[in-house]
Each structure stands twice: as structure tokens, then as C-alpha cells.
Amino acid sequence: MNFETSRCATLQYCPDPYIQRFIETPAHFSWKESYYRSAMSQSTQTSEFLSPEVFQHIWDFLEQPICSVQPIELNFVDEPSENGATNKIEISMDCIRMQDSDLSDPMWPQYTNLGLLNSMDQQIQNGSSSTSPYNTDHAQNSVTAPSPYAQPSSTFDALSPSPAIPSNTDYPGPHSFDVSFQQSSTAKSATWTYSTELKKLYCQIAKTCPIQIKVMTPPPQGAVIRAMPVYKKAEHVTEVVKRCPNHELSREFNEGQIAPPSHLIRVEGNSHAQYVEDPITGRQSVLVPYEPPQVGTEFTTVLYNFMCNSSCVGGMNRRPILIIVTLETRDGQVLGRRCFEARICACPGRDRKADEDSIRKQQVSDSAKNGDGTKRPFRQNTHGIQMTSIKKRRSPDDELLYLPVRGRETYEMLLKIKESLELMQYLPQHTIETYRQQQQQQHQHLLQKQTSMQSQSSYGNSSPPLNKMNSMNKLPSVSQLINPQQRNALTPTTMPEGMGANIPMMGTHMPMAGDMNGLSPTQALPPPLSMPSTSHCTPPPPYPTDCSIVSFLARLGCSSCLDYFTTQGLTTIYQIEHYSMDDLASLKIPEQFRHAIWKGILDHRQLHDFSSPPHLLRTPSGASTVSVGSSETRGERVIDAVRFTLRQTISFPPRDEWNDFNFDMDSRRNKQQRIKEEGE
């Protein structure tokens, strides 16, 4: 900003002490300070919010940003006579944009919200760091769980204990990670088979078992697939699954192999496989790089071999194991997890069939015990004579009856009734009693609501006295009929010019005195306005849809006090929202219910106290205003800062020329002194 030179002595006047930072020319400061020194005198919190420390922190965190400055200058000079006193006002506005394409800093999301800048400044002053508030999309795409069995990459990582028990919970993750198997045979000659019913894999030792890996979205570059065996039962889960000493020390399956002899799981046909043993927990796993599926396929196939039988002594020793397959990043963060049980045996088809038959028999026996609850038939042998079991005569409730039905609609209705009656037999008695009590309460509530509607219509037809107009039949205002989110959008600070003419509420028919009294419970109000909210605050909680006195007292547990209100013509909560404790006492409400109703009225008032915050902050002198915004475009960090500066310069002539302009201050002082003496 250039200043014109004057032969007159210059005295700079600042209307606000906070503006004094802007009086010196930018040459007196560094480039950063000259553009980021700001002041706000609205409140202590506001001044701290835009303090130089905050801008310095933003500048440091942006490292080397790309800045663009758009200066706007306005000058006003009041010079009535030549070489006389002048009054010059200069207004400057700098629109500064800082942007950076680096999004690796986790603190960046804090600068994308205007309200969070204040909390950041407080955290800086307190010497503490705050966590970044991630939104839903960011959490789904970026937040990943750390690997519980990742190798430590530094001394610090090695000092932190790894979990001794890896998680076996299925987790599809952000990429919908899934593991499946091909169509398998149950023949005895099959080398492997998978039971979807038991979620269990049966395979022979050292035989190839293909596993299909599927993701909906491609994982990040360098992702790997890890396979790790763990014991299934809780008493064995802390032990590491390894091969038995017999197979580990044998030459069979070990000669010419890259995999260590103690590893149970091996990968076949992949030279990039890496066998890992955690130095802390000792758990063994195998890693292969993730490869996208080939053209025309949905899956990525990995060939695994299991190098020890489940029945080997010294190894698994007939203890069931689980295979945990995870999709991880190169630094060990888990992107997805799948788990299935495995059994390595000599005849997979036979063992699968035996296990499935055993499970089915167990399910049938359990259902029989839960169904009739009868004991086993009684058999008795005496003197060599075998007594046959006497079958119970089937009770009428166990008979199967058939009812011919005509029409699909009638059949489906009867089918629902049949299923409901059968399901009711499996419910405990206390659940049924609770359901019946709830139905009775709802029935009583409906009856009270109907009576209140009738009384409301009767009071609406008669005209109340003039002295009771403020307390009787007070209809809700238009702002109360509009839902709270739209009410925030219709505030004077956010409604654009000319918006009132386009509001549908003004053009539609609003139910007034007669319409509101005749409004039935099933009749809906006009549809809500679909107006975008310009407030950046969280919208208030929704108001209760039923604003009648009946529902209000029912929520407070004071339904017995309904008559005190209906006798005075009070049917909606809007008629009592401004009541005080004395007003409730005048209604002769018992004292034990009076405090509860008063608290409910206060809670109802708080729902109406939400308003959109001002978008323009001003200082008391109006001299300096700073607004900060932020935006993110195409993965870049952008911070917009606008600085307003007001400078007023008053120029006076030299002291020896003051007499020409009636600026003789000594004569003025003498005159005031003489007036003071005469007054005394």
C-alpha cells in the first residue's frame, strides 16, 4: 500500500488497539507475518481463534504452500483546504488462498471446519494434540485395523507386546474381502472337500487345496494375503500350531523346499511366497502378494498345502484348528479377514460325511427334546420276558389336520396365522405377558387420545371469553409447524433475498382455527419444505410428532393429571410452553406431579432455542474483520483467508502555522482558565 508524502507532520490514529498490528508497513514484518497477523475483539475466544499463533501453525503445517493474493484497496481523503488538516481513511482487503496437495497429515481434517479451528487453537495453547474427526466416507476408506501379528519394523515396535491371540472374527473390510472354495466332491477318493454347512475344510496331507480370494474394490498397491493356523478351543489357543517332530525331521516333503520344515501351511506355485515367524509370539504364517483376477474371472486363486495330519502325536494331536486368511497392506494393517476350520486327514470325503451326519442327528435330537419334552421309552426285562415299549397315544394337539383353502390370498393369510401360532409356542411365558401388557397400555392410550380429540372439537366450536384468549385454544405458530431443520434454514441471516415469495408454505392452505380442530390423527400436515440448510452447525433433535397434552403427560408419567388441563381447554403443549410454576399451581395440579411437568416444559423450551450462528463476526469498533474458510478440491488442501484493514491518518500542519487555522492551543487554555476563575 503506497502513501503519498506530505510536508505536514503525520499522526496516525487507531480506533482500536488491536488494529495497531496493521499500522506498520509490511516491510517491517516478514512475508508470513504481514499477511497472517489478524485481530478480533468480539470476545476473548474469538481473538484467540484468529491469533497469529494459529496462522503460524497453519503455515508450518502447510510446509511450502502455493499462495495467491488478491489485494483490494479503497482510499477516502477529506482535504478542505491546501496545507490544512486532512483526514485520510484507507481500507484494504487481502484475499489469500493457500493450497497444498499433500494429504498425509492427519491433522488436516481439523482445518476443513470453521468451528474446529477454535478447538485446535485451544489445544495448541494447552500443549496437547487433538485427534482428527473423520467422517463416514473417510472411515470406510482409510481407517484400518492394525495387524495383531505383523512383524516389528523397529526397536520401538518390538518393545510393544503383540497380541497372543489373533482375532478369528470375519471382517469383510472396506474392500468386501471374501474367501471361497470351488465345487468339491464328497467321494472317498477326493483329496480335499469343503463343507459349507460346517464351514470346515477337509484335505489330505501335502495335497494342493485351491482357495479363491475375492474383493469388490482393488486394495492398495503392495497388499498381501496372509494365512495363519491357530487352535480353535480356548484351552489350546495360546499354543503355536506347528508340524509334529516326525514330519518336521523327515526328508519327505522337506527336500528341495524353501519353506521352513516347522511351518504347517505352504504355498505352491508362487515364488514370491514369504514365510514369517513372529519373534514375539512365535506364530508362523505365510504371505503372498495380492494379484488381481485375470480377465474373465472374479477370483484370485492361491494354492495351499497342509503338511501335517490333525491326528499326529506331538503336533496338533487331534486338536481342531482354524485357518485365518487376512488381506493386509504392506505395513501390516488388516483390510479384511476370513476364518474357517481345517482338518487334515487320510480320507476327507468320509470324515466330512460323518461329521455332517453327526450334526444332523444332534439337531434332530435337540429339536425333539425342545418340542415334546418326553423321556426315552421305558424298557424292563423280568424273568427273561422282554416288555415292549408302550407308545403314548397321540394327543389331539399333535394331530396333523388339513384344511382346503381356495384362493392364494386367503392361503397366505392363514399361513401367517399358522406360523405365528407355532412361533408362540417357543416364546417364554414372561415374554408373552410383557407383550400383552404393552398391548393393553397402547389400547388405553388410544382411548384417552380419542376422548381428548372429542373434547378438543367441543372446545373449538365454542368461543372462549376474551380474557382467556391467551390461554385457551392457542394454535401453534407457523414456525412451530415447520420442522426444526427448515426453521434454521429460514432464519434472516441465511434466507436469500426474494426467497419469501417462493416458499410453498405461503401459497398453500394453512389449517386455521376450524381446520386444526377438525384435524384427525390420520390426516397429515402439508409436506415439509425441501430447502437446503446453510448452517454448518449440527441440526437440533427432531420435535415430537404428537404435540398433544395427552402424549406429553404420558411421556412424563403424569397421565392422571389430564383432567386439570382439559377442563381449562388446554389440549396442546404449545398452549402451556410459557407456563410457570405458579401457573401450574393455579391449575390445582398435585405437588408430586407439578415438578415433573415443569421439567418437561423446560425440556420442550430447549428444543426451540436452536438458531443458526452468525456468519459475519464484527468487532465493537467495526475496524477489523477476518473470516477464514476452507475447501478441498480434487485431493488438495485449500485454506482461504480474508483480511480487512482500516487505517485512519489525520495530518496536522506544523505548530508554527496553527494560528492561521485557529489551532492556538495556549490561548484556548488561558481562556478556559479565565472562565473557570470567573465561575469560582
From Swiss-Prot:
Biased composition (Basic and acidic residues): 351-360
Domain SAM intervals: 541-607
Consequence recorded when altering R647C: Heterozygous mutant mice have reduced fertility, reduced ovary size and accelerated oocyte loss via apoptosis
Primary gene name: Tp63
Region described as Oligomerization: spans on this chain: 394-443
Chain residue ranges for the region called Disordered: 123-171, 351-393, 436-472
Assigned protein family: Belongs to the p53 family.
Name of protein: Tumor protein 63
Organism from which the protein derives: Mus musculus
